[in-house]
């Protein structure tokens, strides 16, 4: 089912997320994507805790990140997370911007739905 539900999260780039040039290390962008995705799922009332109670897991099966410009130590970044599809996959789009509204990064993730009792995907 195609949907379009968005949430905006704001974070300050922490010192432990940057390199010696005070630029956020590229792998740490994924951590901010995950924190933003968790906030959106909390907002929807169906977070990972609820999924687990229902017997499901949602592992990331695809991640695509485009880096446009760097984030720096102590920058405030805005992550707009949009859930675009939910059925046999959860598909999210992310836009990371700085306080000036400049695009820093854009990303997409896909999560498969797995039944924990048999570790089978819920594809039809």
Stretches with model-predicted labels:
Residues 40-78, 82-91, 104, 112:
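Hydrophobic beta-strand-centered segment that forms part of the acyl-chain substrate-binding groove
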Residues 2-60, 114-124:
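Hot-dog-fold acyl-thioester-processing enzymes
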Residues 3, 7-9, 72-76, 83-124:
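HotDog/MaoC-like acyl-thioester-processing domains
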